[in-house]
Amino acid sequence: MRLLLAFTAALVLAGAAASATVKPPVIKYRDDRFGPILATPKKQALYYWTKENDFRIHCKGGCARLWPPLVVRSKAAVRVHVAGINGTFGTIRRPDGRLQLTFDRRPVYTYVHEGPTQVLCDDVNGWFVVRLRG
């Protein structure tokens, strides 16, 4: 019985340590024009599309090739809150079965023709860079 309890405690501690070391798939980045924005760890700006206001995925096929979704491996890899970022993270299942990151209930995307630190498509055809409060 003691061995079982010790083993269970070790598993719990290992799980807690593993989840504590999971790096968030996003960072807060300060853009000269837009102020604090949400970006990938490689400083690629993240966008949302105003046509996706019903918590359903509408950007698929050719749209998703131009606007690649920020996909995550599992819900467990996503923290609901990330230090220094005001807002709530979550996931939504895409039509292909992959999980896409959401921020304040909106699926987030990158733009394929942008490099790190670029913001080229804010307010273009309903796409907006994710601006952060504070």
What name fits each language-model region?
Residues 1-5:
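Positively charged n-region of N-terminal signal peptides that target proteins for export
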Residues 6-14:
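Bacterial N-terminal signal peptides
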Residues 19-134:
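Compact beta-sheet-dominated domain cores in extracellular/mature segments
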